[in-house]
Amino acid sequence: MDCKLHAKNCGGCPLLGLDYAAQLKQKEEKVRALLGKYGPVHPIRGMEQPYHYRNKVISTFAVGWGGKLTSGIYAANSHKVLPVESCLLQDEVLDKTMQAVRAAANACRYQPYDEDKGTGLVRHCLLRRGVATGQVMVVLVTAQPVLPGAKNFVKALLAETAQRGVTVTTVVQNVNSRKTSVVLGEAEKVLYGKGFILDTLCGKTYAISPRSFYQVNPAQTAVLYGLAVEAAKLTGKEVVLDAYCGIGTIGLTAADHAKQVVGVELNRDAVQDAIGNAKHNGVKNARFFAADATRWISEAAAAGEKADVIFMDPPREGSTPEFLASVARMAPKRVVYVSCNPVTLARDLATLTKLGYKAEGFTPVDMFPHTEHIETVCALSKRDIHGKKPSGRR
């Protein structure tokens, strides 16, 4: 499929020129080359419609033609903003919403932030959509706490989105006055609605705030988490540890099939979301704690605590030797490793294999079509497990 942005050095879809079937084959072969020696690699799970899957958009403001405000993404290997009217990966509702944001911002005569001079007002716009609910969030990131004519901006935005057939659920101002490439700041002000949206995933409803971690491809996330829970082989009697749990999506998906779930996540905002999500869904057998996963599991293992199943979903850099050693000390019957980087998964598997775990198999999931990223679900098992269960310690 042709894309004008791809021809302008967008850099967001390096595999766009490759037939989708060939993309899937390439990714599956990469996983097999890296992980095949540890166990069988099952066919990759691709998408039937590998376009417009992203439920989250981040757009950067800049000066466009005629001095008007425009927005888009940085061109590859540069700080030049490439204007974006629409994108083959983005939810089409969010494309229309961003068009409305630009129109409203121009109507209010907002000036884009200049990162070199430190002048201007609006820096970025973050958009999120609950695909199952249709709810839309607009987050306007400003360099200053005061947003002149905030009510007029909201009024103009709602009018512009309505003209495009879009209903906005909430509008939030996020303040980021630092000189940084990080998009969001710490301070927020709700300008319209409740400041969050809802979405449904794997039978559970999640509240998504501006800073919440939530997978950008809900269709493939359901596939990924379904595979992970299936790999755990839960019977309803297990105590489960959900490490690097984020807002609790894997743990809450597994909770219906387990005796108890204990989730651990470093990001305190995410943990608060996880606790709220458990309450909202009536899940009473899940507890979540804000802590570094390596430190938490090391202390739990040193205290002699055990788990029947451990889910681990670490960042791209993978886990740590200390974490993996503590996994072995906790002696779960099964470990389900959800990886977003097959290179670090291979590294961690070498350690887990030495610690007595065997990989039963790997299923790649194409979470991000037209990019080089690959998600992989790996199930590992170990026999003769005995000991105490996690107590939900702090």
Go through each PLM region and give its residues:
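Short helix/loop segment immediately N-terminal to the Walker
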Residues: P112-T119, V240
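Short, acidic/hydrophobic/Gly-rich beta-strand patch recurrent on exposed beta strands
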Residues: G72-A75, V139-V141, A274
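Nucleotide donor/acceptor-binding cores
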Residues: N55, G134-V136, K237-E238
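Short cysteine clusters
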Residues: C3-L5, C10-C13, C340
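Extracellular/lumenal ectodomain signal focusing on beta-strand-rich modules
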Residues: P43, K56, H124, T170, ...
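Rossmann-like S-adenosyl-L-methionine
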Residues: P148-R394
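Short, aliphatic-rich beta-strand segments
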Residues: L127, G134-A143, T205-S209, V309
